[in-house]
Design a protein with these regions (language model features):
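Active-site beta-strand-loop-beta-strand hairpin of nuclease catalytic cores
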Residues: 40, 44-57
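Short beta-strand or tight-loop elements
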Residues: 30, 42-44, 351
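Short, basic/polar, glycine-containing "phosphate-handling" surface segments that engage DNA
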Residues: 95-152
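Short beta-strand-loop-alpha-helix junction that forms the active-site gateway
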Residues: 51-53, 59-70
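Acidic-basic catalytic patches of nuclease active cores, encompassing PD-(D/E)XK
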Residues: 1-37, 49-50
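Nucleic-acid nuclease catalytic cores
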Residues: 65-106
């Protein structure tokens, strides 16, 4: 048997052993790439996940490495650190030849398989339940100084009352109920009440909207920022992020519509950036707040970092997830939803308002696959019939871009088409779709 075949067999055997021992709460993948917060990627023979978070990365090496480890004990520690792992493991072929590294240390512990499992499960006894008032003090103390404004502090403080907080003594987790957790996340987002919004898109999108009488949302996988789906996970996951099937499933069942404030309608910069170089269309929406139910539809402005390495709201969330007292830890059960409302400061000029749809089996929605022409990624779409009153955004006007070919003809034709299809409300046939007022852009 070749060395590579033997190595592959050792990895798969160890992977299955961890999978069997750790149980259903863990996912154990092989040959998985882990991305650090700073954009570096590292390949590990085995990666262990819990709650979609990277718990540990494992490198499987031959037995001869143990001699080198004695001579150079920090071997591979920099790899674990640079990958942003909380736990790194070297396996040398025998059950008693595991070298365990944990974040904050500059050396390994030599442990057996059971010791590794106990360390990963972090089985700690849970003390007496924490009084809610004391819990409020603990959590609020984790607010970064720059973020500790009076309004945010007050909104979060009000959440700590009977009925809002659950304590799972069996697993040692404290959590909010879903309504309270939604309020918690909204308190960390920009505080704006939005009754109108607009979206820059292609002329083809307007055509399909009128032709098919359907609103279209794309899955998260087709976002223009390739780190879109992992940015927040990276930040609060201590820098280590890797995709597994469950994360892919979440991303393909979560759909997005990127909007901006209505004050940005017919804005030259927005036309250039998002309106197909001013050849596209700006759709204007009215928001039906009653349909933003925080069950299937979520609608809110996006929070942006203050610098490349600082995002205070995510820092607060990270502090909460790393908090512990008497064995108790805090769990955010709706993180998989609200994490998509946090983005890198590199995109702060967008001032994005985001509509998120999380697929709900109770609602019958048409879905299809496309090959995204811009990013060449296979992506899912979901389509909402305009005639069914379930979509929170209602188009009330459209503006054809200043650089659109045959602008006047397109305005007339789309208005006539809309009069036949009755998609955008109108008083006069030629008022629903108008030309941009910008006249000096080429």
């Amino acid at each position: 048997m070749t060395y590579l075949a033997s190595q592959k067999e050792s990895v798969e055997k160890l992977r299955k052993k961890f999978l069997k021992t750790l149980g259903d709460n863990y996912i154990v993948g092989s040959n998985t790439e882990v991305s650090s917060f700073y954009g570096k990627s590292f390949m590990f023979d085995i990666v262990i996940f819990k709650n979609n978070e990277v718990v540990a990365g494992i490198l499987v090496k031959n037995f001869c490495l143990s001699v080198r480890l004695i001579c150079k004990p920090d071997q591979y520690i920099n790899v674990f650190k640079d990958a942003g792992l909380r736990c790194g493991i070297l396996y040398l072929g025998k059950d008693d030849e595991f070298y365990l590294w944990t974040d904050g240390n500059w050396s390994y512990q030599n442990v057996d398989f059971d010791g590794i499992v106990n360390s990963l499960k972090d089985n700690r006894p849970v003390g007496e339940p924490i009084l809610i008032d004391d819990l409020a003090v603990e959590i609020l103390s984790l607010l970064p100084d720059k973020l500790d404004d009076v309004e945010c502090h007050h909104k979060i403080e009000l959440l700590f009352k009977e009925g809002n907080v659950n304590m799972d003594k069996l697993n040692g987790y404290i959590s909010f109920n879903s309504v309270a957790e939604d309020i918690f996340f909204k308190a960390l987002l920009p505080q704006k009440r939005i009754s109108k919004a607009c979206r820059y898109t292609s002329l083809q999108s307007l055509f399909l909207l009128l032709k098919d009488k359907k609103h279209c949302m794309c899955s998260l996988t087709c976002m223009n920022d390739k780190g879109e789906t992992s940015y927040a996970d990276n930040y609060v996951g201590n820098g280590a992020y890797a995709e597994n099937y469950q994360i892919l499933e979440e991303n393909n069942n979560c759909y997005i519509l990127s909007c901006c404030a209505d004050s940005k309608q017919d804005d030259l910069t927005m036309w250039r950036l998002y309106g197909c170089d001013a050849k596209g269309v700006c759709l204007r929406y009215k928001v039906n707040e009653k349909l933003v139910d925080n069950k299937s539809f979520f609608f809110a402005p996006v929070s942006y970092g203050s610098s490349e390495k600082e995002h205070l709201e995510l820092e607060f969330i990270n502090n909460i997830l790393n908090w512990t007292k008497n064995g108790w830890r805090f769990k955010l059960n709706r993180w998989h939803i609200w994490k998509h409302f946090f983005k890198s400061y590199l995109f702060k000029d967008e001032n994005e308002i985001r509509l998120l749809y999380v697929h709900n089996n109770d609602i019958e929605i048409e879905k299809c696959w496309i090959m995204d022409s811009k990013n060449s990624i296979a992506s899912r779409l979901c389509l909402f019939d305009i005639d069914k009153d379930i979509f929170p955004l209602k188009v009330y006007s459209a503006i054809i871009g200043p650089n659109c070919n045959q602008q006047a003809s397109n305005v007339a034709q789309f208005n006539y088409m809309n009069m036949q299809q009755k998609v955008i409300p109108f008083n006069r046939w030629n008022e629903a779709i108008v030309a941009s007022k910008i006249r000096d852009y080429r």
